[in-house]
């Protein structure tokens, strides 16, 4: 997931 960088939860 690219958005993983913006989602610390992931």
Curated annotation (Swiss-Prot):
Pathway: Xenobiotic degradation; quinoline degradation. It comes from Comamonas testosteroni. Heterohexamer of two alpha chains, two beta chains, and two gamma chains. This is Quinoline 2-oxidoreductase gamma chain. The lineage of its organism: Bacteria, Pseudomonadati, Pseudomonadota, Betaproteobacteria, Burkholderiales. Signal peptide: none annotated. It comes from the Bacteria. GO terms for molecular function: 2 iron, 2 sulfur cluster binding; metal ion binding; quinoline 2-oxidoreductase activity. Keywords: 2Fe-2S, Iron, Iron-sulfur, Metal-binding, Oxidoreductase. Its cofactor is [2Fe-2S] cluster. Binds 2 [2Fe-2S] clusters per subunit. Its EC number is 1.3.99.17. It catalyses: quinoline + A + H2O = quinolin-2(1H)-one + AH2. Converts (3-methyl-)-quinoline to (3-methyl-)2-oxo-1,2-dihydroquinoline.
């Amino acid at each position: 997931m690219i958005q993983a960088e913006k989602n610390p939860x992931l």
